[in-house]
Amino acid sequence: MMSLLVVAAIVAAVALGYKTKINIGLFAIAFAYLLGCFGMGLSPSEVIGMWPLKIFFVIFSVCLFYSFATVNGTLEKLAEHLIYHCRKMPQLLPFAVFFTATVIAAMGAGYYTVLAFMAPITLLLCQRTGMSLIVGGMAVNYGALSGANFMSSQSGIIFRGLMTNAGISDNDAFINATGIFLSTLVIPLLVIGAFVFLTREGRAMKASVFEASAPATLNREQKITLGLTLAMMAIVLAAPIAHILLPANGTIAFINSKMDIGLIASIFSVIALLLKLGDERKAMASVPWGTLIMICGVGMLISVAIKAGTIDVLASWIGGSIPPILVPVVFGVVAAVSYTHLTLPTICSV
């Protein structure tokens, strides 16, 4: 009975979120409290303890540091430079848009932020070059998605955090997150390539010409921000990759065990503030609080579901009713009619 109530609560949280436009995570927190305390006899402190503190801290810390690159215009300036260098090869413009969006999202801007400032640029390029709006839109969307899935970017961090919370080792979580990133990098390239080289509109772009004025050079704050961002990405990725390649090396194993992307990002945020690379209030406001509340709120409700045995029942039902090859398809359909960040906690728990 309790399992049915928990499933009903998850469905109700989604439905109420869509209907009222209120963050689904807030409804999930309310249902977690009501079901946990009054339905299962848990104490309020036990329910509060289900808040995924580590995931919250990591996402907050990383997004806070990366927000400096958004606030001081580093990412927008970088996008202008990358696209400018493709002006003499118009047929490759969709790939330039894709890789530009990928790089910027991988540097921490996140999916929606990249869409917000890359979409107008891409629309202007489509008007000037005759590039299909469909191809341009696909390039921006795919690039933002791929970059956000990078291991040290927003969605990549969420993937890794949820997997480690589900009991997967840090190394395996890193490898799995790398596979997710690579799949969302390679498949879009094949799709965009087919549109560019196999369609009439794509072949017509080869003869088109568009003018682009040289963008201004990066200022002091933007250069330092770019350097710090690349340095943090290198530090965060070097340790786990080295440990995977040399698992028997004691020194590398020790260093890797002390690495935490959230704590490292916190140090870099302090450095950025000391160097006055951006306004603290604006950087704090750029943190995706809505996404954080949604993920953590749903995480609390999923923890209640695990406590009630709902996830075990759901996993057994899926294992006995759906062929393994169709499981990704089923969850893909669920994600298509829901929020990705809502579907993720459930999938990782199952």
Language-model features, listed with the residues they occupy:
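Alpha-helical transmembrane segments of multi-pass membrane proteins
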Residues: 90-105, 129-146, 169-177, 325-337, ...
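Membrane-interface interhelical connector segments
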Residues: 313-324
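Helix-loop-helix module between adjacent transmembrane segments
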Residues: 62-67, 100-111, 141-151, 179-191, ...
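Membrane-core helix-loop-helix motifs of multi-pass transport proteins
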Residues: 123-218
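Alpha-helical transmembrane segments of multi-pass membrane proteins, especially transporters
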Residues: 28-32, 94-98, 115-119, 136-143, ...
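Membrane-embedded helical hairpins/re-entrant loop segments and their flanking transmembrane helices
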Residues: 74-93, 314
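Single conserved hydrophobic/aromatic residue that forms the stacking wall/gate
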Residues: 341, 346-350
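Hydrophobic transmembrane alpha-helices of multi-pass small-molecule transporters
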Residues: 1-58, 66, 181-185, 189-313
